[in-house]
From Swiss-Prot:
Its main location: nucleus. It comes from the Eukaryota. Keywords: Cell cycle, Cell division, Chromosome, Coiled coil, Developmental protein, Metal-binding, Mitosis, Nucleus, Zinc, Zinc-finger. Residues 150-165 have a biased composition (Acidic residues). This is Zinc finger protein 830. The gene is znf830. It comes from Xenopus laevis (African clawed frog). Residues 99-118, 125-135 have a biased composition (Basic and acidic residues). GO terms for cellular component: chromosome; nuclear speck; nucleus; spliceosomal complex. May act as an important regulator of the cell cycle that participates in the maintenance of genome integrity. One of its GO terms (biological process) is mitotic DNA replication checkpoint signaling. One of its GO terms (molecular function) is nucleic acid binding.
Length: 356
């Protein structure tokens, strides 16, 4: 009897293991493949931008479309644009070719500067997050190529200008923020650059010219709108043109709208007054009906009172008649007896019964 119990326990454990394996497979299939998604050691899903845990993979699209996530993305993009714009506004002196020893010094100083200032990649964001910044920073390639261009026909006297460039760059690096990325120094020739120098995944500094152009366009549009709104009424002789420029309704349309609104208000007032009159009529009708009912009740009461009085009078009359009839009957009986007495007395007693 003990052997079947063990078999059942073993079967239950195997079933549990199979169920857990299936759950793991289903959970692995449902994993979110997104640069913004992150799984911890326990397999819990979290958002890299918001630093918030997400209960289920089904809630990931709703979180991406949420207001908080969009605000965080906009803030990060805004800080990226603000930190990258000052680095491009620094003006460097004219760049010339230096001797072979100068590039080595430049490289050593660049490594020191990179160690002193942390790069923008410490934000722990995915590489494909700022794709727009990468496309906008593509305009820096010509300037970088100019910085890294060939300058073979320069004399050795240009070394002094190279030293001035180094001093200017050191002064500018002290002004850069920790999130900014310094520009690469020029080398002796373009062949020393790696093959994928302009195709790396590191977020490049966006050019401030595009931002300035967008700001200028927005200002122009705002000025145009402000000028159209600032025009006084009647600036143009034609009222229709004046209304069109000031982006308002034409006088005729305005009059029509006002007339329609007036008619609408009149209809509303009429409906309200009709409702009030109907309510008052209904109340008056009910009051009249109540008064009529009260009058009918009073009339019925009077009729009942008259009927009762009639009955009492009839009863009294009947009693009087009965008493009179009794008295008359008694009077008649008494008169008959008195009339018979003398006739009996005057008769002869001898003749009594003679004819019988």
């Amino acid at each position: 009897m003990a052997v079947p119990g063990k078999k059942k326990l073993v079967a239950q454990e195997e079933l549990r293991k199979l169920m857990k394996a299936k759950q793991r497979e289903s959970s692995s299939k449902k994993r979110i493949e997104s640069p913004l998604a992150k799984y911890n050691s326990l397999g819990h899903l979290s958002c890299v931008v918001c630093n918030s845990l997400i209960k289920s993979e089904l809630l990931w699209p709703a979180h991406i479309l949420g207001k908080q996530h969009k605000e965080k993305v906009a803030e990060l993009k805004g800080t990226k644009a603000t930190t990258s714009s000052p680095s491009n506004t620094i003006e460097y002196p004219r760049i010339t070719k230096r001797k072979g020893s100068e590039p080595e010094k430049q490289e050593s100083k660049r490594t020191k500067g990179s160690e002193d200032h942390p790069s923008a990649s410490t934000t722990k964001l995915p590489e494909e997050f700022f794709e727009k910044e990468k496309t906008s920073s593509a305009g820096n390639a010509p300037s970088l190529k100019l910085l890294a261009g060939d300058y073979e026909d320069v004399d050795d006297d240009d070394a002094e200008e190279g030293e001035e460039y180094e001093n200017a760059k050191e002064a500018s690096s002290s002004l850069l923020k920790p999130a900014e990325i310094p520009l690469p120094p020029p080398t002796s020739s373009a062949d020393n650059l790696p093959a994928d120098f302009f195709e790396n995944k590191m977020p490049l500094v966006s050019h401030s010219g595009s931002v300035l152009k967008a700001d200028i366009q927005e200002k122009i549009v705002e000025r145009k709108e402000n000028t159209a709104e600032a025009l006084p009424e009647g600036f143009f002789d034609d009222p229709e043109v004046d209304a069109k420029v000031r982006k308002v309704d034409a006088p005729k349309d305005q009059m029509d709208k006002e007339w329609e609104e007036f008619q609408k208000e009149i209809r509303q007032v009429n409906t309200v007054s009709e409702a009030i009159v109907a309510e008052e009529d209904e109340e008056g009708r009910l009051d009249r009906q109540i008064d009529e009912i009260d009058e009918q009740i009073q009339c019925y009461r009077r009729v009942e009172h008259l009927r009762d009085r009639k009955d009492t009078l009839q009863d009294a009359k009947m009693e009087v008649l009965k008493s009179k009839s009794n008295e008359k009957w008694q009077d008649e009986i008494g008169s008959d007896d008195e009339e018979k007495l003398p006739s009996l007395l005057y008769q002869n007693w001898r003749e009594k019964g003679a004819f019988h």
